[in-house]
């Protein structure tokens, strides 16, 4: 089999997977750069010394590298560019994979930082043990990842945005009582964003479908435990939350009290937009004698929301020992 035949077969095989990846995760996103690390990309850079590549490979530069690898045998690549033979045999499939990523993402270049996967493992270990402090805040990346999932499952954007904002406002209104921090607030935000994504799969079993979607979908920047907690927050937004002893088996590694607290907040935020017409926003809060009063200044008829609200406060009262009250102020 000639080199060109091998290239065509590999390209056809690889493109199938890359196209599936594009359809699932990229869609219409504007991808400007691909980041590549490891020996594979480092060896490919050796093939074009005349290109003076440092930490970025343009599309045109990569096309030159690609043709050189396609037209050269592993034996020659190894001898001419000082690449170990076993690594040289991998250069053609690596070149095809990167070229396919460029074609399918329409990225402008490939960024090649001088780091390896092992560097990442060491940095992660040092960060967790307090010997290295990473200042990068990944919240925006996590939210962007959740937004992609919400878009994929065609959630009602206006409804989820309203529920999300109300949930965060409730969370912020009595911090001194719930004792939860920034990370838990982020989990509540993601749960609110994805609480109805399962309706795209099954309208009648939307909540359980949402649970399964979150459990089976990686969210960049979240641990498996955090994602499991978010899935259960969404589940118990609608379903009855049993006692800790009975619930622990189904919760697996999730923290029961965290799930209970955040699910109780999400329940209130969700019913505040029961009609899906965004009648309630910009609430004013007052907390006194363990009563959390939510005052809404609106001329809208919130009879539906107010009625259902009263049926959704039990878990909140049990978990926090706080009575939530919804009041309407009909201002002009």
Q: What is the predicted function of each stretch?
A:
Residues 272-324:
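Low-complexity, glycine/alanine/valine/leucine- and proline-rich hydrophobic stretches
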Residues 4-267, 273, 288-290, 294, ...:
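Helical "lid/coupling" subdomains associated with nucleotide-phosphate turnover
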Residues 108, 320-332:
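A short amphipathic beta-strand at an alpha->beta junction
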């Amino acid at each position: 089999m000639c080199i060109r035949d091998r290239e065509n077969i590999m390209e056809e095989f690889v493109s199938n997977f890359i196209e599936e990846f594009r359809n699932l995760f990229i869609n219409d996103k504007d991808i400007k750069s691909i980041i590549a690390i490891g020996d594979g990309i480092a060896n490919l850079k050796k093939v074009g010394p005349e290109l003076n590549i440092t930490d970025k490979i343009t599309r045109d530069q990569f096309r030159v590298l690609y043709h050189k690898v396609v037209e050269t045998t592993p034996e020659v690549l190894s001898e001419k560019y000082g690449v170990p033979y076993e690594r040289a045999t991998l250069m053609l499939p690596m070149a095809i994979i990167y070229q396919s990523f460029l074609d399918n993402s329409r990225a402008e270049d490939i960024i090649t930082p001088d780091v390896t996967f092992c560097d990442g493992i060491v940095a992660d270990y040092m960060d967790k043990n307090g010997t290295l402090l990473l200042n990068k805040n990944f919240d925006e990346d996590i939210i962007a990842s959740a937004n992609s999932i919400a878009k994929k499952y065609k959630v009602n954007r206006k409804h989820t945005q309203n529920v999300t904002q109300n949930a965060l406002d409730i969370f912020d209104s009595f911090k001194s009582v719930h004792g939860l921090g920034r990370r838990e607030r982020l989990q509540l935000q993601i749960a609110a964003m994805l609480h109805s994504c399962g309706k795209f799969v099954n309208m009648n079993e939307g909540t359980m479908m949402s649970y399964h979607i979150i459990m089976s979908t990686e969210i960049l920047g979240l641990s498996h435990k955090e994602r499991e907690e978010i899935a259960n927050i969404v589940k118990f937004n609608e379903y009855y939350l049993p006692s800790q002893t009975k619930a622990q088996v189904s919760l697996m590694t999730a923290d029961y009290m965290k799930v209970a607290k955040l699910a109780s907040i999400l329940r209130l935020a969700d019913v505040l937009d029961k009609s899906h017409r965004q009648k309630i926003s910009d609430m004013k809060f007052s907390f006194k004698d363990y009563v959390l009063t939510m005052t809404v200044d609106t001329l809208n008829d919130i009879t539906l929301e107010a009625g259902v609200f009263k049926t959704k406060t039990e878990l909140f009262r049990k978990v926090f020992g706080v009575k939530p009250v919804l009041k309407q102020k009909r201002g002009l």
